[in-house]
Structures are given as structure tokens and as C-alpha cells.
């Protein structure tokens, strides 16, 4: 039996700078099943929004009964750890979520995969309300024309070949399902990230090629449910994992590639890549490749101030890396942490998962160190989350602080709220 442990920390012990600050924490545990998972986190102005996948009954004494084998779940929590509402979306078949984002209008977007294009059923549990079942009968079954500081995507591998439809659910801030759109895909793949725009969203994803490799795509989706053309990047060895919408309406996309892109060939074993892309035609306007001899590098997160986070791996060294770039592609500053298996960021906060003791982070194996950084990348205030095996997501929100979603060593999922 898995558990979702929600740990909200008003103040955290400083892990990367002094003075130390300590305070009690509040903890709430929500029962789940063995295969339940959290795939990402975002927020509105007042609440944290968590997306995941569930099987069987959920939420203990207030069950959201299963709709199919696997269903998508969206759940909201306030800063005290209270579950404000939960929404379960699915069909009689399997439906899984792969990415989440919240736009400037506080509408929640959840991308995923489904076995069919049929209309979903929604089971909702608002705070202090009885569970009800609602069918979105006003929706069409399919659409014919087929963060800024949120890091939320978790990949689903291996991709099941029977999940043939990419789906996007649109939910309001009170947990009401507004729309659900579906688009058939010819190749196995999934959405890795959602970038909110002014008139809809951009889907960033991958497709599995016949050779078993990965190529990436960007595709627009209007608020009316119209899917735009897919623009592809790479042929069989390019993976895009995150991105942001820039002030000039271009997209910054990050990930990794082991093939030539925009006439720039791979220099290491696998290069970390930063692409500046025109969303109207998919043209690569700029490309920055981060590489090293024999190194496998990958960027996992990006922020609007051109700060990126990821990893670098060689035969002898694994590192977590956080860097900020200029608009011309030069490195303004970079922080490297030996013995780290993951590093993600937003525009002001970093989360690093360590697999061994690290003197710079003052951490030990299994710690997720979270810190707020200054304009030079140096830590200002930090905290640590022990006994962790994975960083699922990172979100900062004015008025709420920072929330980190992690997977613990016992298999549970933990949300930790910090005061910066």
C-alpha cells in the first residue's frame, strides 16, 4: 500500500547557508494503492495543485471510486495541508496523466494518454461535500483538427502501445472539469511538459521511432480545443523535457540530443540542448549545446531567466548542474554538485538529489537539498528533504512559498512546503 505523505514546513532547517532556522511541521497522510503515483505539481494563487495516476479507491474514508483500470487524478491542497478538492478523470479503460501546468487565468491543464477518445467521466470530491459523478456530455468526443516557473513532468516508460490517444483535460481552480480533448497519434509517445500561452497551451513531447529511439515535438492547443501542426526536432535521438514561453513569444525548450540539430553536431556522448524556437513554424532560431568528452548531459528544467537544471554523467563522475545563460548563449554562472542524480530549478529555487555526501550542499545520500539562489547562483536560504529517491516536481508561488514533490525511499510521495 503506497502513501501520499504531505509534509508542509513553515520553516526549514538551513542546509546550504546560515543562520539555521527550525520549526515544527504539519503532516497529513493520504492512503493510496501500490501503483498510485504523483507525476507533477503546480499552483494557483492560493493552493497547490498535484496531478497523478491512481487505481482502485482513493482518499481513504472519502473514496473516489475507480472509473477504469487507471485514472488521472488532480488534487488541491492549501498551505496547511488540507485537501481542498480532488478530481478523478477517466473512462472505462486506462487513462494516465504525464504533465501538468496552470495558466495565468488559473485554469489547470493536464496532459496524458488514453486507450480511446471517448468522453471521460469525472468524479469530484470538493471540500465538505459529498462525492458526485458527472459526465461531460456537452463535449465532443474528439477534436477534428487534430511553467513559467513550474517543473512538473515525469516520464512514463515504457510507453504502452495501446495508449493511442494524447489527451488534455482542462480544469478550473475549483476542481470542475471544463473540457477534455483527444488527439490520435500514429506513433507511441507522450507529453513531457505543458507551456501555457496567451490563447491556449503548447505541448512538448516525444515520439518513439521505429528503431526505438526518441524524437521530440511541439504542438499548440487552443482554448477551443484545436490542435495545431506538430513540429519535430531530431530523428531518433532527441528528447525535450521542459520549456518556457518568452516575452517575444518564442519558446525556449531544453533536453538532450545525440544527433545533429540545426547544423550543429553532437560533441559529447549526449549533449544537453537549449533551443530557441518559433512556435508558428517550429524553426530553431538559436541552439546551445552543453557537452563534454564522453559525457552524457541533459537539461531537465528551464526558467524564464534562462536558468536551467540537469545532470552530467561520465564513467567516473555523476553531477547535478544548475547554470544560467545569457541571451547570446554564454554561461553567466554554473554550479556543479558531485554525487547528484538529479537537479531541477525554477527562476529562483533549486532542488538537488544527492546519492552521496556532499560538503558543498552539507548533505548525505538520499537528501533532496532545496535552496533559494541569488543573481550569482549562490544559496541564500535552504532546506533538506531526507530519505528521497526521486524529485517529481518543484513549484514556487508568491504568497505560498516553494513546494517540492519527491518520492521517498519507502515508496511514498511527499510534498514539502518551504518558506521561500
Residue ranges and their predicted role:
Residues 1-7:
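Bacterial N-terminal signal peptides
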Residues 13-420:
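A sequence-level/structural motif corresponding to short, flexible coil/turn segments enriched
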Amino acid at each position: 500500500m503506497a502513501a501520499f505523505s504531505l509534509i508542509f514546513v513553515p520553516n526549514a532547517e538551513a542546509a546550504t547557508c546560515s543562520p539555521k532556522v527550525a520549526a515544527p511541521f504539519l503532516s497529513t497522510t493520504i492512503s493510496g494503492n501500490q501503483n498510485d503515483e504523483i507525476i507533477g505539481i503546480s499552483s494557483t494563487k492560493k493552493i497547490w495543485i498535484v496531478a497523478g495516476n491512481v487505481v482502485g479507491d482513493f482518499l481513504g474514508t472519502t473514496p473516489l471510486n475507480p472509473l477504469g483500470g487507471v485514472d488521472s487524478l488532480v488534487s488541491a491542497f492549501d498551505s496547511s495541508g488540507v485537501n481542498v478538492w480532488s478530481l478523478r478523470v477517466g473512462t472505462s479503460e486506462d487513462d494516465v496523466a504525464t504533465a501538468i501546468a496552470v495558466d495565468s487565468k488559473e485554469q489547470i491543464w493536464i496532459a496524458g494518454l488514453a486507450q480511446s477518445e471517448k468522453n471521460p467521466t469525472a468524479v469530484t470530491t470538493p471540500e465538505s461535500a459529498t462525492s458526485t459523478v458527472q459526465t461531460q456530455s456537452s463535449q465532443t468526443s474528439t477534436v477534428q483538427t487534430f511553467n513559467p516557473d513550474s517543473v512538473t513532468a515525469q516520464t512514463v516508460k515504457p510507453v504502452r502501445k495501446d495508449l493511442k490517444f494524447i489527451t488534455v483535460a482542462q480544469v478550473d481552480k475549483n476542481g470542475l472539469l471544463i473540457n477534455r480533448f483527444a488527439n490520435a497519434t500514429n506513433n507511441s509517445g507522450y507529453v513531457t511538459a505543458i507551456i501555457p500561452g496567451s490563447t491556449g497551451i503548447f505541448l512538448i513531447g516525444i515520439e518513439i521511432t521505429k528503431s526505438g529511439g526518441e524524437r521530440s515535438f511541439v504542438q499548440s492547443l487552443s482554448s477551443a480545443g484545436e490542435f495545431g501542426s506538430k513540429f519535430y526536432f531530431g530523428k531518433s535521438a532527441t528528447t525535450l523535457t521542459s520549456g518556457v514561453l518568452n516575452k517575444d513569444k518564442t519558446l525556449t525548450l531544453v533536453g538532450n540530443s545525440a544527433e545533429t540539430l540545426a547544423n550543429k553536431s553532437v560533441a559529447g556522448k549526449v549533449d544537453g540542448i537549449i533551443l530557441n524556437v518559433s512556435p508558428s513554424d517550429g524553426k530553431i532560431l538559436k541552439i546551445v549545446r552543453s557537452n563534454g568528452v564522453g559525457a552524457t548531459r541533459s537539461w531537465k528544467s528551464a526558467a524564464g531567466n534562462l536558468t536551467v537544471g540537469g545532470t552530467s554523467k561520465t564513467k567516473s563522475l555523476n553531477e547535478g548542474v544548475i547554470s544560467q545563460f545569457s541571451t547570446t548563449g554564454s554561461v553567466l554562472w554554473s554550479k556543479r554538485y558531485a554525487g547528484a542524480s538529479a537537479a531541477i530549478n525554477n527562476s529562483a529555487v533549486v532542488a538537488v538529489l544527492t546519492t552521496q555526501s556532499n560538503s558543498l550542499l552539507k548533505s548525505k545520500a538520499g537528501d533532496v537539498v532545496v535552496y533559494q539562489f541569488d543573481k550569482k547562483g549562490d544559496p541564500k536560504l535552504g532546506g533538506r528533504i531526507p530519505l528521497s529517491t526521486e524529485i517529481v516536481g518543484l513549484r514556487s508561488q508568491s504568497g505560498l512559498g516553494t513546494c517540492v514533490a519527491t518520492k521517498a525511499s519507502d515508496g511514498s510521495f511527499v510534498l514539502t512546503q518551504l518558506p521561500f
